[in-house]
Amino acid sequence: QAAPVLDHIQRLFEELNAFLKVNKSPDYSFLYDQVVSYGELLSTTIIHLYLQHKGIQNQWLDARTTVKTDDYYRGANLDWKRTQEAILASVSKNELVITQGFIGSDANNFTTTLGREGSDYSAAIFAFALNAVSVTIWKDVAGVLNGDPRVFEDTVLLHQISYREAIELAFYGASVIHPKTLQPLQRKEIPLFVRSFENPTAMGTAVSKGKTLEPHVPCYIVKKDQVLLRLSSLDFSFIVEDNISDIFALLHQYKMRVELIQ
């Protein structure tokens, strides 16, 4: 029974090896996306074949054929119109679909990745396109906590939280959910459940419209390895909009994320 699985895996490795032999691009971000995407392709292939072996019929879908993006590698921006059309044309609501998170493709069909927490974002993308009833994301924590349990003692599970509160927490650095994941769900008011795969019967955290932070506790976020960049003009004049635009263009060019401006 192992032979078909190994054959599929071998073909993926051969595909990757063929790309590496002909690749001439010096762009690290481009090369990164072409290579790391194979982790998702390999793992979903194994799951797909395992379920087939157990008699559970399912459709293996290459997310690169449906999630369409620009060519901003390692943090690609979604083409929502093309993506929705491709998903609706490829996914049957009556089938179990096994697909990848984190990856897509650009207009030239080169692989792209969606950045930090891109797999969760992929789930939200498919949910948005398919008008899903809800989305459940399985994590190694009980749900959304009011602080990082590796830093703070006696952290509290947030049972219910609104989209706005979850986006605010995520924006300021809470790592369980990424703001990009929440935005498409909020637009269609699709509830999000964050649950623990270590305790699958526990309810975890529910994120939905109109839910207030429950219980009412303060939330703490710690960011490590931050860099403070202080800018001033040589002629002591104010930094105005044109200067700020130039600064952010450079930061964007070098894929540097700004956490706070003062």
Q: Which positions does each model-derived feature cover?
A:
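Nucleotide/pyrophosphate-binding catalytic subdomain
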Residues: Q1-I177, L182
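Flexible, glycine/charged-enriched surface loops at secondary-structure junctions
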Residues: P4-V5, I177-K180, P191-P200, Y254-Q262
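A conserved regulatory-domain signal marking ACT and ACT-like small-molecule sensing domains
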Residues: G204-Q262
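A broad, low-specificity signal marking well-ordered, structured residues that form hydrophobic/aromatic
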Residues: V97, T112, L192, T205, ...
